[in-house]
Amino acid sequence: VYSALKRLLVGRPIATSELEHQRLRKLVALPTFSSDALSSTAYATEEILFVVAAGTSSLALGLSRLVPISIVVAILLTIVVLSYRQTIYAYPHGGSSYVVSRENLGSKASLVAGASILVDYVLTVAVSISAGVAAIVSLPAFRGWADQRVTIGLCLIGLITLANLRGMKESGTLFAFPTYLYIVTVAGMVLYGLYQIYFGDDVGRIPFDAEQAEIQREAGGSLGLFLLLRGFSSGAVALTGVEAIADGVPAFRKPQSRNAAITMMAMAGILGSLFFGVSVLAHHIHPVPSHDETVISQIGRTVFGEGPIYVILQLATVAILTLAANTAYADFPRLSSIIARDGFLPRYLGNRGDRLVFSNGIIILAVAASLLIIAFGGITTALIPLYAVGVFTSFTLSQTGMVVHHRRVREPGWKLGLAISALGATATFIVLLIVAITKFTVGAWVPLVVVPTIIALFSAIKRHYTRVAQALEIKPEEVRPQPFNHTVVVLVGRIHRGVIQALGYARSLRPQHLVALYISHEDDDREEIQRQWREFGINVDLEIVHSKYRELTTPVIEYLEELDQRWNNDTITVVVPEFVVGKWYEQLLHNQSALLLKGRLLFRAGTVVTSVPYHVEGYGIVPSVQPKASAAVSPNGAGDTGAKPPKDADPPDRAADTPPAAR
C-alpha cells in the first residue's frame, strides 16, 4: 500500500545514470532558481512603504523617499550580481556561501555562512507563501478568507513539497509558466501605467490624508534617518534569492558556468526593472500599505481596473509567490547535502531519494517553514525582519571569500574581480549592520540567536562523527586471530514451528554455549513449558526465569548479565523467533514484545539480536528458511533426537501471544 501510494504521488524511481538528463536548460532554470528573487518585487516596495510611510500621516514623506531608496537597492543589486557572476565561474560545482567560505575563510566562517543561508532558505519559503496568501485574500472574492491564512499557507507548502519530491526537472517545467506569466503581467502593468502617466490620461491616485506630512518632514533629525535606513533595510529584501543561481550551477546543462552566468544576468535585469518600475508607479499612484490589500494589488487595480487583466495579475502573483519557495526547495537540500558530507549534519541528508532529489532535506525544509507560518500567523510583515539578516550575512562572507580567492589564484583580470568582490563585501556588510540595528527589536534578534545555535549544533554533530570514527579505527597489526567466546540464547514461548526453526538456526552458529530461555509469569507456565520440552525431546538446555512484574525485557537483560559473569562471553547472540502474518492489518492483533526487546538490547554492549521470521500465509505455513529435518539440538551442535512437533501442537497465532516469541 505504501509503495503504491508513493509511486502515485512521487513517481517512479529514477536511475542514477539518468541524472544528466535531469539537468535544466536556461529557459527552465530561470524560473526554477529566480522565482524567489523575482517574486520579491511583489512585496519589496510595500515593505519600504510600511516602514517609511508608517501610517497615513507620513505617506507623502514615504512616497517622496520611495524612488531614491529603490535606486540605492538597484545599485546594490548590480554590485551583488556582478560579484556572484565571478563565483559562478570560480566554483562550477556550486558556489554557495558555505563552499566559498570553507575554501577561502576556513571552517568557522563556513559554518556561519551555512547556518545563515539555511535559515534564509526556511524564511524564503515562509515569506513567499505568506505573501502568496496575502495576494489571494487581496482579491475581492476571497477577502473573507483572511482569517484562514495559516491553513491556506500550509496547503500551499504541501503542494510545492510534493512537486519537488517528484524531481528537479518536473518541478522546473511545472513552475516555468507561472513565473513567465508574472513577468509579462507585471511588466505590462509597469509599461502601461507609465505610458498613461507620462503620455496618456493620468491613471489617477489613491486618495490619502496628507495633512500632517509636513510635520513628519520637519521632524527630520535622527528619527528621519532611522526611518530611512529602516525602510532601505526592508527594501533590501528584493535581493533575497539572487545567490540561488550560483548555488545551483550543477543543475544546469553544459557548459554549466556559462549558462548559469547568462541566466543570472537575465534575472538581474528583469528583477531590477520590475522592482524599480513598481516603485515609480507607487510614487505616482499613492497606494496605502495595508494588511487587507497588498500594494501591488492596489496598483494593478488602479492601472487595469477590476477586470480580467487585474485578476490574471493577482493569480500570477499568487503563483510566483508560491513557487518562489521552489528556489529554497532546490538549494536547501543541496546545501544540506554538502554540509552533511563534511560531517556537520546527519549523513542521511546527503543521500538522494528515488527521484534523484535530496528527499530528506526537502521534508525538513517543509516542516520548518510550516512551523514558522504557524508561529507568525502567516503575516508577511512579521516575518520580513527575520529574513534579511541571514541573507546579508551569507552575502558578506561569500564576497569576502571571493576577495581571498582572487588574491590567492590571481587569474587573468583578478584585480578587477577583487575590486568588485571587495565593494560587494563592504556594501553588504553595511546593509547587514543597518538591518541588525534598525530591526533588532522587531525580530532581527531571532536569527542572531538561531544562527549561533545552529552553529553549535553543527559542531556537536561533527564531534560525534569524529569520536565514532576514532572508536571504529583499527590498524592492520590489530587484526589477528584470537579466542572468541560465543553464547547463543534462544527466547522461547510455547513450542511452535517458529521456535523449532529458531533452534535450528541457533545450532548452525556453532556457539560455545547454547541455551533456551523462557520467561514465566505463573507457576503453571513453568510446568507447561517443561512438559512440552520433554514431550518434543529437545536436547537444548532450557532455563526458566520468573518475572514477578510480568515484564519481558528486564528479566532478559538481567539473565544476560548473569551469563556474562558465568561464561565471560565476548558476544551473546539473542535469537528471537517471530512469525509474519499475511496481511499488514493482521499484525495489529499480535503484541510487539519482540520489537520492544530488540530496541532495548540494541544498546547493550557485546549483544547481537537476530530475528528468525516464520511466514504464515492463511492456514498454510511458508518458512522463510528451510528448517533442518531434525528439530532437536544439542548444546555442542552434535546429536539429534529426530523429534517432530505433534499434530495437536499449538497453532502459531495462539503460541505467538505468549512472550517472548510473539511479534
Tell where the protein language model's regions lie, with residue ranges.
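Membrane-interface loop-to-helix entry segments
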Residues: 160-199, 263-267, 384-396, 416-427, ...
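Loop-to-transmembrane helix boundary motifs in multi-pass membrane proteins
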Residues: 107, 147-154, 251-273, 340-374, ...
